[in-house]
């Protein structure tokens, strides 16, 4: 997503990035102003990192203004001290601000030095920006999420597969697909869609990074949906189809996997095909219930009639109807005949 915003650090910030790694700087605040990353303020190390945390971070957090906080921790890694990157994007921020900060974070990490950033925190409430909030985030991050009944069944199935001696474990375990990681902007867009911010999202897989990124988040009419489907690359799409069925108003979320024939490379086709199952599961983990999953090769297929038929297929009476066979044609009244006597 950093390639889409074009926002980069200004000269002052780049210069400070080189200086702040000398071990004396504890925290710095960076914001997006006038389409560039700017240094807002910074503070030096006072005490150990836990005692400095609330004292130095709290004054930097403004109620409704997003920013990035880079906080130096006290343990070292091969490149020097480890740093925490906090993205402060409050719920009250505008949709544009949320998108901008989510999609620019990769650029910030690159220009600061990704190797120095060992921990990340996305904060949307002031409680999450405190030391207690950070510690809770660490606990939650390291605790496995509870499994649904379906996930528990799959976990048990995998255990069974691993114990078999047929030599086909790898193949069986890959039948579920490849679980590609998602960019922060993807998670934010899913969160915003669940809250009613968008009715359409488009995603792409970075084949080199093997990561799913957000391409577009918008509100579009159904008539404009076909035009969103690329003709040269595969994509994933989420669309909220608003319609009526049997007198009820429905808002059904449709997951669309578009693959424009053989104009895509073999690797691209394989990646999108393998990742679609796990990615749709990730979408549902973010609170979006997918009503229908579709695969198309042409955007023209996405008409109102098509979506309605896919969501509510007509019930067909499969019982064969046989007409009662007609009786033989009438041959008049029956006649009784007496057997002739044998002479």
Swiss-Prot record:
Q: What Gene3D superfamilies does its record include?
A: Severin
List residues of the ADF-H domain.
Answer: 4-139, 177-312
Which domain of life, per UniProt? Eukaryota
Record-annotated membrane-spanning stretches: none
Q: Does Calcium show up as a keyword for this record?
A: no
Q: Where is this region: Disordered?
A: 314-343
Identify a single GO molecular function assigned to this protein. actin filament binding
The keyword Cytoplasm belongs to this UniProt entry's keyword annotation:
yes
Q: Where found?
A: Cytoplasm, Cytoskeleton; Cytoplasm, Cell cortex
Say where the protein is mainly found: cytoplasm
Q: Which Pfam families match?
A: Cofilin_ADF
Q: Which InterPro entries match?
A: ADF-H, ADF-H/Gelsolin-like_dom_sf, Twinfilin
Q: Which keywords, in A-to-Z order, does the entry hold?
A: Actin-binding, Cytoplasm, Cytoskeleton, Repeat
List, alphabetically, the GO terms of the cellular component aspect.
actin filament; cell cortex; cytoplasm; myofibril
GO BP, one annotated term: barbed-end actin filament capping
Q: Which SMART domains match?
A: ADF
Question: Which regions form coiled coils?
Answer: none
Q: Which family does it belong to?
A: Belongs to the actin-binding proteins ADF family. Twinfilin subfamily.
Q: How does it assemble?
A: Interacts with G-actin; ADP-actin form.
Q: What's the stated role of this polypeptide?
A: Actin-binding protein involved in motile and morphological processes. Inhibits actin polymerization, likely by sequestering G-actin.
Instruction: Please report the name of this protein according to its UniProt entry.
Output: Twinfilin
Organism from which the protein derives? Anopheles gambiae
The upper taxonomy is: Eukaryota, Metazoa, Ecdysozoa, Arthropoda, Hexapoda
């Amino acid at each position: 997503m950093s390639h889409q915003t074009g926002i980069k650090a200004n000269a002052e910030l780049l210069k400070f990035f080189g200086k702040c790694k000398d071990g004396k700087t504890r925290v710095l605040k960076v914001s997006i102003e006038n389409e560039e990353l700017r240094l807002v303020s910074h503070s030096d190390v006072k005490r150990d990192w836990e005692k400095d945390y609330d004292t130095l971070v709290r004054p930097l957090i403004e109620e409704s203004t997003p920013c990035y906080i880079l906080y130096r921790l006290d343990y070292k890694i091969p490149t020097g001290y480890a740093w925490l990157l906090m993205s402060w994007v409050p719920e009250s921020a505008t949709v544009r601000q949320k998108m901008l900060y989510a999609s620019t974070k990769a650029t910030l990490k690159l220009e600061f030095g990704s190797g120095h950033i060992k921990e990340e925190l996305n904060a949307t409430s002031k409680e999450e920006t405190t030391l207690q909030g950070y510690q809770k985030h660490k606990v939650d991050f390291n605790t496995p999420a509870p499994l649904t009944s379906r996930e528990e069944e799959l976990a048990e199935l995998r255990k069974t597969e691993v114990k078999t001696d047929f030599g086909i474990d790898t193949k069986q375990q890959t039948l579920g697909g490849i679980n590609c990681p998602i960019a922060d902007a993807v998670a934010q867009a899913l969160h915003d869609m669940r809250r009613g911010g968008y009715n359409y999202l488009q995603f792409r897989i970075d084949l080199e990074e093997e990561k799913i990124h957000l391409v577009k988040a918008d509100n579009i009419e159904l008539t404009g949906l076909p035009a969103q489907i690329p003709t040269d690359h595969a994509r994933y799409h989420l669309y909220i189809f608003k319609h009526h069925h049997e007198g009820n108003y429905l808002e059904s979320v449709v997951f669309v996997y578009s693959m424009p024939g053989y104009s895509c490379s073999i690797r691209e086709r394989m990646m999108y095909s393998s990742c679609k199952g796990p990615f749709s599961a990730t979408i549902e983990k973010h609170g979006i219930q997918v009503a229908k999953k579709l695969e198309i090769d042409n955007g023209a297929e996405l008409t109102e009639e098509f979506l309605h038929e896919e969501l509510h297929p007509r019930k067909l009476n499969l019982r064969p109807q046989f007409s009662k066979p007609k009786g033989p044609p009438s041959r008049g009244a029956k006649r009784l005949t007496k057997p002739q006597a044998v002479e």
